[in-house]
Amino acid sequence: MASSLLTSSGMIPTTGSTVVGRSVLPFQSSLHSLRLTHSYKNPALFISCCSSVSKNAATSSTDLKPAVERWPEYLPNKLPDENYVRVFDTTLRDGEQAPGGSLTPPQKLEIARQLAKLRVDIMEVGFPGSSEEELETVKTIAKTVGNEVDEETGYVPVICAIARSKHRDIEAAWEAVKYAKRPRILIFTSTSDIHMKYKLKKTQEEVIEMAVSSIRFAKSLGFNDIQLGCEDGGRSDKDFLCKILGEAIKADVTVVNVADTVGINMPHEYAELVTYLKANTPGIDDVVFSVHCHNDLGLATANSIAGIRAGARQVEVTINGIGERSGNASLEEVVMALKCRGAYVINGVYTRIDTRQIMATSKMVQEYTGLYVQAHKPIVGANCFVHESGIHQDGILKNRSTYEILSPEDIGIVKSQNSGLVLGKLSGRHAVKDRLKELGYELDDEKLNAVFSLFRDLTKNKKRITDADMKALVTSSDGISLEKSNGANGLKSNGYIPVLQVSSNV
């Protein structure tokens, strides 16, 4: 498994870290002032909002690891402080609904263990009412991962199962998750006019009664952590949402979420919806408000951030953004956005995700689902810390922060200062000189000019230049004979990879 976590460009995910740090420094700021809302004993934490919580010894002598913090007491409907955002991961439920992304029970268990290493607050692990196999899988996760308490921090995840507003679904959910230390049920019902008319064939009053009855039934079985999900909330009447949420709160629900199920909302629309519901729903301050966004218009992350900015304090996400149709909000994108910008533009919001586990988790989910991310996928794509433009490479060699706002170590990648530089036709003299130096060649200006000229000629026939190519360029005194090639790696049409032919006069 470890070898499969290797990434391109010499980047390797780190593993096994148990130190938990806040993903962002929880402070508030404005254009003219900076006010800390929490005291910290370690001043090194203030070096940079996006600096890694732990520097690898190979890349830095500075240790930025914060002191281990105890996990706050878990109260289903209360947060440890107003800026804390709970991360609700639904990779194993909504994520698995991605076409072609089904998982075996052992794979789901292994991903659940990895999600625990990531320190998600809640993991929604399945739909027990859908089949006996699913019920048993959820039960296994509840009995194992749901009871594995970290002795140092006190962390243990909430194990959640989803159910329709049907008694048989709710009974199956209880049978599956009751073994966890912190069981939760998410009961969902449709709230948009189009869903109520064509899918449920029920009136608003009937939908409210169905939701309230389901909440009460769940409580009677033993659930004390109950979430109501409003499916297609993004297209629902605002006042009806206020009404059904208010009735659910009276019935002792602990969490409410309004889902942009079809990904239709713009960020400002979704923020306005959250703001309206929080201002006009009786008892809304007695529960946790959650957001759940889909990516049909490519706005799931933006909408999730907008919802948090409007006051939501639970965000529902999946690893790599997998899910129905175009997917869900991506955990890595939302978490790293909060880590880098939450302190500055969202009043100091933060999560407790151990971001150093992001890359390992992403790779595991890709391998098990067969749903591989594109190279330019934010945060976890192969190109995220790779630079080919000469101007960019020059800046990176001088200081990585010139063109990188994230530290690779932040998401669990160990890399050298120059391992993200891809040599190609856009690379400049500085990058070529630095790569040669890394390979052990110290060249004077005349020799460097000669090698760089040969390098530029080679890039006309080959998109990416390897270290072997660079060595051949240096040792050549008479030039290079290179077969005409094409393709990203210099492949000829017959699949043959051309080799540099070097001739020397002795």
From Swiss-Prot:
The protein's annotated catalytic reaction(s) are: an omega-(methylsulfanyl)-2-oxoalkanoate + acetyl-CoA + H2O = a 2-(omega-methylsulfanyl)alkylmalate + CoA + H(+)
One biological process term from GO is: biosynthetic process
Q: Which UniProt keywords apply?
A: Chloroplast, Plastid, Transferase, Transit peptide
> What is the taxonomic lineage of the source species?
Eukaryota, Viridiplantae, Streptophyta, Embryophyta, Tracheophyta
The record's annotation in InterPro entries points to: 2-IPM_HCS-like (IPR050073), AIPM/Hcit_synth_CS (IPR002034), Aldolase_TIM (IPR013785), LeuA/HCS_post-cat (IPR054691), PYR_CT (IPR000891)
For this entry, the protein name equals Methylthioalkylmalate synthase 2, chloroplastic
In its UniProt entry, the species of origin is given as Arabidopsis thaliana
- Phenotypic consequence of A67V: In strain: cv. Ka-0, cv. Lip-0, cv. No-0, cv. Sei-0, cv. Tsu-0 and cv. Wl-0
What gene makes this protein?
MAM2
**What PANTHER family does the record point to?**
HOMOCITRATE SYNTHASE-RELATED, METHYLTHIOALKYLMALATE SYNTHASE 1, CHLOROPLASTIC-RELATED
